[in-house]
Amino acid sequence: MQPTPKSESELLLRAQDLAGSTLGELAEQAGIITPPDLKRDKGWIGQLLEWHLGAMAGSKPIPDFPELGIELKTIPIGYSGKPLETTFVCVAPLIGLHGLHWGNSHIRHKLARVLWVPVEGERDIPLADRHVGSPLLWSPSIEEEQQLRQDWEELMDMIVLGRVEHITARHGEVLQLRPKAANSRALTEAYGANGQPIKTLPRGFYLKTHFTAAILARHFIL
């Protein structure tokens, strides 16, 4: 793995150096085998870029570059230049919610400063041949943070009221909550409608594609 970058500008410079390379080239440099597809290795692209950029956090609940307070997010892009799928941010807390508010939430911490790295994502392009795009460093604008906060508060209210199983991907304007589990047996605790403990699938917060598309469009003037 590459050494951890010491500044935001060093990190951005490194990410810019990767732009134009294929995933196959980057994997070869890192001595990592490129899988045939991402069916069993959903996080493979992120891990490959973490290696090249010197990210330290891995799956810990802190930003990928803790010293810089920056989170790394890869974003698969289609031929249209638009994101192909929603972006996972973090696992949602379903119990122990007393005293939790937007200001001290894990999701706000994760989205405070993000290094977005677009990657070709169309399935007809072999994984090894997909190119990495130009990176951008982003922090939410006042308006974006307001949108995120509003959705988060609405979703967390439903969780607190024991309505987690009633939440669908349609709830939220820019943020959605949906099950995140490799298999349906991986259950976790939550509150039921009468405050009783229930078992349910873990949930994750995801950014909707129109939100991430707007970030890219503003930066790259698509």
Swiss-Prot record:
Keywords: Cytoplasm, DNA damage, DNA repair, Endonuclease, Hydrolase, Nuclease. It comes from Photobacterium profundum (strain SS9). The lineage of its organism: Bacteria, Pseudomonadati, Pseudomonadota, Gammaproteobacteria, Vibrionales. SMART domains: MutH. It is found in: Cytoplasm. This is DNA mismatch repair protein MutH. InterPro entries: DNA_mismatch_repair_MutH (IPR004230), DNA_rep_MutH/RE_typeII_Sau3AI (IPR011337), DNA_rep_MutH/T2_RE_sf (IPR037057), Restrct_endonuc-II-like (IPR011335). Its main location: cytoplasm. GO terms for molecular function: DNA binding; endonuclease activity. Pfam families: MutH. Sequence-specific endonuclease that cleaves unmethylated GATC sequences. It is involved in DNA mismatch repair. Belongs to the MutH family. Gene3D superfamilies: DNA mismatch repair MutH/Restriction endonuclease, type II. One of its GO terms (biological process) is DNA modification. One of its GO terms (cellular component) is cytoplasm.
